[in-house]
């Protein structure tokens, strides 16, 4: 695929911190990624632990964000890379959905931040105020002490829980082959009752 192809450029959004499918009303539960062909330079995947990041917040911040609701859309994440023109069909497909900023894991009950580059607005806040809050929280949550860097080898298989991690791929040499196969396990419930995110 040519480097200037729209699909290729659109997929560069995977270099931003994100949680898979947070732009869907019912986001993904797990993801699995398998390495078939590894790029010789770059292409590591970084994972940030949103449980540890939440635990490290001060009590005042935890109280401030406890009940906040964010709007998630692919138009937010791709917009930050300069994608501003969408067809009417894409606008309908990528309509913002609502997600809680703080999630409680349904199995072990531990709280975590639910951040993603797809989050572009916070309900009840002005756009600049909400985006600054999300940026501050993302900078906090992706500090080195919360991040695992996976350096891929052929046949590696990594599985993660999207409900308590964010991840991103690092830049790599686009002139060299790279073959990664991903599977995603669908979630079973929304993080918040959906309303029209207008």
Where are these predicted regions, by residue range?
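Non-heme Fe(II) oxygenase catalytic core, chiefly the N-lobe of the double-stranded beta-helix
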Residues: 1-157, 162-198
């Amino acid at each position: 695929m040519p480097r200037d192809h729209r699909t290729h450029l659109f997929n560069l959004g995977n270099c931003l911190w994100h949680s898979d499918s947070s732009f869907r009303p019912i986001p993904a539960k797990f993801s699995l990624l398998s390495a078939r062909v590894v790029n010789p330079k770059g292409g590591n995947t970084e994972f940030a632990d949103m449980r540890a990041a939440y635990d490290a917040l001060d009590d005042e911040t935890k109280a401030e964000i406890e009940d906040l609701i964010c709007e998630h859309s692919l138009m937010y994440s791709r917009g930050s890379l300069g994608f501003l023109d969408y067809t009417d069909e894409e606008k309908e497909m990528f309509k913002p959905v609502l997600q809680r900023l703080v999630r409680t894991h349904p199995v072990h009950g531990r709280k975590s931040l639910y951040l993603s580059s797809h989050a572009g607005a916070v309900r009840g806040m002005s756009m600049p105020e909400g985006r600054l809050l999300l940026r501050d929280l993302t900078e906090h949550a992706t500090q080195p002490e919360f991040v695992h860097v996976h350096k891929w080898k052929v046949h590696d298989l990594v599985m993660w829980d999207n409900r308590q991690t964010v991840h991103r791929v690092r830049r790599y040499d686009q002139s060299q082959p790279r073959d990664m196969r991903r599977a995603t396990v669908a979630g079973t419930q929304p993080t918040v009752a959906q309303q029209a995110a207008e």
